[in-house]
Every structure is written in C-alpha cells, then in structure tokens.
C-alpha cells in the first residue's frame, strides 16, 4: 500500500482555521493551535449570544414601554393586563416602537387599557 502524505489536506485545514481567525489579536490570528482554540471559543460565544440577544431585546422593549407608561401614572404590568382585557394584541416590539415614535397613538392605547381595567 502506498504511503499517504497529508500535507495538502493539513495545509488546507490550517488555512481554513486561520481565515476564520482573521482579525483576532496577536497569536490568535497567526498560530494554528491558538487560532483553533480561539475560533472554537468564538463559536461558543456566538451560539450563546444568539439566544441571549432575544432575551435582551425583550428586556429593552419592556423597559421602554414601562418608561412611556409611567409618564401616565400607570405601571407596565397593569398596562399589559389592560391591553389584554381590551383584546388589543400588539407585541412588545411594536408597542415600544409606538411609544418612541408615535406618542399620540400610544396615549390612545393607554386610555383604552385604563378603560378596560375599570
């Protein structure tokens, strides 16, 4: 059986990892062994943070809605409960956009939520 030399395959693998590590600081972008670890860790962070991003945006939307609702002497939880009772199904992302860019419409939503609570 002929001897299999792996130089071409190994070089291709090293090149692939170093390409992924491009832009990293110091040895992480130049030395294969270190770059390999850095790329794996970066992948772990990316996987984790794709899930955290969803939580963080929801948290941001809730904070924005709460800030806008408190100007009308109402709490976030009672506002959301009032909207639910009034059968107004708008998600938090859209509510926060309305609160920021269209205060007039948001005030109407607050009034409807207050009426539904009475």
From Swiss-Prot:
A cellular component annotation (GO) from this entry: ribonucleoprotein complex
Stored InterPro entries: Ribosomal_bL20 (IPR005813), RIBOSOMAL_L20_CS (IPR049946), Ribosomal_protein_bL20_C (IPR035566)
Keyword set, alphabetical order: Ribonucleoprotein, Ribosomal protein, RNA-binding, rRNA-binding
Molecular function per GO: rRNA binding; structural constituent of ribosome
SUPFAM superfamilies with a match to the protein in the record: Ribosomal protein L20 (SSF74731)
Pfam family, one: Ribosomal_L20
GO biological process terms held by the UniProt record: ribosomal large subunit assembly; translation
UniProt family annotation: Belongs to the bacterial ribosomal protein bL20 family.
Function: Binds directly to 23S ribosomal RNA and is necessary for the in vitro assembly process of the 50S ribosomal subunit. It is not involved in the protein synthesizing functions of that subunit.
Name under which the protein is recorded: Large ribosomal subunit protein bL20
Gene name, Swiss-Prot/TrEMBL: rplT
